[in-house]
Structures are given as C-alpha cells and as structure tokens.
Amino acid sequence: MGTVPELASLSFEEALKELENVVRRLESGEAPLDESIELYARGDALRAHCQARLDAAQARIEAIVADRDGKAQGLRPFDETVG
C-alpha cells in the first residue's frame, strides 16, 4: 500500500479520498486476504477519523449559531484547537 500517512495529519478531505481508494480496492476483489484485512482495518480507522472530524465541525457550528438557551446569538469565534 505504500507509505501510510498518520490519521491525525489527514484533513477530512484527504481521509475521505483515501477511504474511497480503500473501498475501491476491497470491492475489486484483487487484494490477497492479508492485504484485504489490512485495508479493512485502515478503512475502519479512516471512517472513524472522518466521523470525528464531522462531529467536531458540527459542534463548532452549533456553538457559533446558538447560545445556551438554543437561541441564535450571532457569531462567536470558534476554538481553533478543535478537530
């Protein structure tokens, strides 16, 4: 599979693209069993990474548009350390 980038260093878009490639490779049926198992594990980790990035983005958006009562409060700076 070549060099495998660390998940933490991948943007959502990079992780999604890699996940699509993993799925394509698995669906082709051409990978040997051991490689298929490695691909599946990598794909599962990529899926979890993408979900975490989406969850973090959703939390930031909700913090921006709602106050503690759930009413629109305008824009507030979001925490740059999230995600």
Curated annotation (Swiss-Prot):
GO terms of molecular function: exodeoxyribonuclease VII activity
Location(s) in or outside the cell: Cytoplasm
Biological processes per GO annotation: DNA catabolic process
Record's keyword annotation contains Ubl conjugation: no
Pfam families: Exonuc_VII_S
A Gene Ontology term for the protein's cellular component: cytosol
UniProt entry keywords in alphabetical sequence: Cytoplasm, Exonuclease, Hydrolase, Nuclease
Catalysis: reaction(s): Exonucleolytic cleavage in either 5'- to 3'- or 3'- to 5'-direction to yield nucleoside 5'-phosphates
Main location: cytoplasm
Coiled-coil segments: none
EC number: 3.1.11.6
Oligomer status and interactors: Heterooligomer composed of large and small subunits.
Family per record: Belongs to the XseB family.
General function of this protein: Bidirectionally degrades single-stranded DNA into large acid-insoluble oligonucleotides, which are then degraded further into small acid-soluble oligonucleotides.
Name recorded for this polypeptide: Exodeoxyribonuclease 7 small subunit
Gene responsible for this protein: xseB
